[in-house]
């Protein structure tokens, strides 16, 4: 697949992260590591990783308007479909491949995770928890529970995935869960790796650090 690469042309913008998972992800990334952010949006996470730990970060984003936003901020991005472009990268191209709220938008999540494990030495995934107790109450009331706070008719398709669902998938695919951090209202809780029921019920989201 032909895609357009836009390289860094200016200083990385200095903007405070707006999401709690960004801070957790930044603590998981080693200083100076190479990073590929899948579905990087406006590049806020790339900027944070570059600024906070000197990461050699680049993004992959399908939306051309968001790519332009990244370029305006002096960030290195590749424009193209994530699942197709991932297959084009050589094995072990990056220290980390990151899905920050983008994994649930993948058309083929299993294949996307497999390719990420091939391309990256480690994979970081932050997932919105569809199994949160508030979402369960909404379903009991006959309502569709939004995964990210948006109306169900707005934005790209997002797959309903609980914390336990993702952990099960990762283990089925022979990934090791190095650590997993639950977040509620943007604030991290106690790390978990094996005991999932509490996070599956109470966490708004969780960030997983995986090794293939």
Predicted regions and their residues:
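Conserved alpha-helix/loop element of class I SAM-dependent methyltransferases that forms part
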Residues: 16-32
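Class I SAM-dependent methyltransferase "Motif I" SAM/SAH-binding loop
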Residues: 39-41
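Class I SAM-dependent methyltransferase SAM/SAH-binding core
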Residues: 44, 48-85
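A short acidic, Gly/Pro-enriched loop at the edge of an enzyme's catalytic core
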Residues: 88-96
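A short SAM/SAH-binding and catalytic strip from SAM-dependent methyltransferases
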Residues: 96-107
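S-adenosyl-L-methionine-dependent methyltransferase catalytic module, highlighting the catalytic core
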Residues: 110-118, 122-212
């Amino acid at each position: 697949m032909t895609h357009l690469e836009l390289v860094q042309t200016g200083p990385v913008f200095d903007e405070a992260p707006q999401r709690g998972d960004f801070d957790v992800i930044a603590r998981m990334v080693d200083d100076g590591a190479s990073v590929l952010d899948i579905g990087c949006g406006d590049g806020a996470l790339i900027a944070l990783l570059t600024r906070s730990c000197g990461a050699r970060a680049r993004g992959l984003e399908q939306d051309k308007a968001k790519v332009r936003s990244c370029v305006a901020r002096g960030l290195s991005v590749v424009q193209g479909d994530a699942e197709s472009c991932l297959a084009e990268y050589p094995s072990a191209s990056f220290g980390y491949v990151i899905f920050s709220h983008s994994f649930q938008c993948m058309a083929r999540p299993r294949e996307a995770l497999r390719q990420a494990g091939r391309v990256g030495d480690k994979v970081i995934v932050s997932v919105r928890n569809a199994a949160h107790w508030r979402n369960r109450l909404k379903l009991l009331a006959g309502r569709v529970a939004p995964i990210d706070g948006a109306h169900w008719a707005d934005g790209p398709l997002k797959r309903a995935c609980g914390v336990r669902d993702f952990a099960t998938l990762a283990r089925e695919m022979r990934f090791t869960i190095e650590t997993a951090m639950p977040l509620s209202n943007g604030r991290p809780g106690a790390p978990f790796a094996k005991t999932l029921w509490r996070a599956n019920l109470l966490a708004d989201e969780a960030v997983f650090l995986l090794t293939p």
